[in-house]
Amino acid sequence: YRRQRQMCIRDRIRYCVEKVAHRIPVVAGTGSNCTETAVYLSQEAEKIGADGLLVVTPYYNKATQNGLYQHFKMVADSVKLPILLYNVPSRTGTTLQPETIVRLCRDVENIVGVKDATGNISQTAHLMSIADGCVDLYSGEDAIIVPMLSLGAKGVISVLSNVAPQETHQICSLYFEGKVKESCELQLKAVPLVEALFCEVNPITVKKAMQ
C-alpha cells in the first residue's frame, strides 16, 4: 500500500509539472510522517522537475524538536531543491517551534523558510524576532494574511486562492504597494468565504466551490 501511495503522489506531481510547463514554479508537497517516504518523494519530485518542495511536519508520531530537526535535515540533504517547512499543528498534532525553524534555516542551506499555518500571531512574531533574516515566511492562514505580511511574510500559500485567486493576489499586492487600508478591507471582505471553505473537512468544500 505504501508503495502504491508513493507512486500515486509521484504521478500527481508529474501531472502538475507537465501541465504547468515552466509557466510558473511548481512547489511539490512531499512530506510524510515516515522520513524514508519523505526522502523518496522529494527525490522523485526533483527528478520530475519540480522547482521546490513543501514538507509538512511529521504527523501522528509526535517527534521531539530534535527529532523534527533530524527528519527535515535528512530530507533536505537528499535533494538540492529549496524547501519550505510546513508548520500546521492543527492537522499534525505537532508544533515546529520557532527556535527549531531558525536552526534548520541557518544550518541547512536549502531549507529557506516556512509556511506558517499555526494561526498563532504571537508565536510567529517571536519567530521573526529571532530569525535575523534567515527565514522566508509565508502565511498559511487565509484569515490573517495581512497580519502575517505585517510581520514580514513574503506572501501566502493559500486555500482561498483556489476559488478567489484574483482577490487573494490583490490582498498581497495592495499591501506591498503600501495600500495597507485597501489590503485590510479586502482581507476582511474575504473572511466569510474563508470561514465557509472550512465549514467541513478540507478539501471537500474547496472542490465543491471550484465546480
Residue ranges and their predicted role:
Residues V39-L53, H71-L81, P98-V112:
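Alpha/beta enzyme core
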Residues Y1-I9:
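Single conserved hydrophobic/aromatic residue that forms the stacking wall/gate
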Residues I24-V27, D51-L54, P82-L84, V112, ...:
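Structural motif
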Residues R10-Y15, T35-Y40, Y60-M74, G93-Q97, ...:
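Active-site-adjacent beta->alpha loops and helix N-cap segments on the catalytic face
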Residues D77-S78, R91-F198:
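Catalytic alpha/beta core domains of metabolic enzymes, predominantly
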Residues R10-A28, Y69-L85, I130-D132:
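Alpha-helix-loop-beta-strand connector modules within alpha/beta enzyme cores
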Residues V206-Q211:
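Scaffold signal of the M16-like zinc-metallopeptidase fold and its non-catalytic homologs
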Residues P25, G29-N33, P58-Y59, Y86-R91, ...:
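Active-site beta-loop-alpha junctions enriched in small/polar residues
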